[in-house]
Amino acid sequence: LQELSNKKLVLIDTSGAESLFVNSLKVQNIDLKKHLIISADCSEAAIARYFENNETWNSLLISKYSETVSVWPVINALMNKSTPLSIANENADLQTPLKNLKIRDLVVKNLKNMQLSLV
């Protein structure tokens, strides 16, 4: 990373299992901002693993977001942690603009998508 020290932004894509690499950067006193990227259809158990050990994230980004996909596990995680919601993408196409999102918007859209039935 020394050769990149003159850069304003360096993105490092790691899997959640590579926390040792991130910890080694912390030891080197490198200022890190960590952003969690999860799929819109991520399970609650998978999301909980990302927040184990009181991990702190600067923001949460949602990939594969669609207004028709139920994101209640994501909403639950955001409500239980103080991680701000950042942006979402609808597909892997880099030309597709990202969406700015707020937790309230996610809740409203998911409530509209719920199918209410009388029992």
Predicted regions and their residues:
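Conserved ATPase-coupling elements of RecA-like P-loop NTPase cores
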Residues: E18-L25, A45-R49, S70-P73
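Signal for well-folded cores of large energy- and translation-related assemblies
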Residues: Q2-S5, K26, F51-E52, S66, ...
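NTP-binding/hydrolysis catalytic cores, primarily Walker-type P-loop NTPases
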Residues: L78-V119
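Generic detector of bulky aromatic hydrophobic side chains
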Residues: L9, V22, L32, W57, ...
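Conserved beta-strand/loop subsegment of P-loop NTPase cores
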Residues: L32-I38, E55-Q95
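Structured C-terminal portions of repeat-based eukaryotic scaffold domains
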Residues: N29, I47-N54
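Switch II (G3) loop of P-loop NTPases
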Residues: L1-Q28, L36-A40
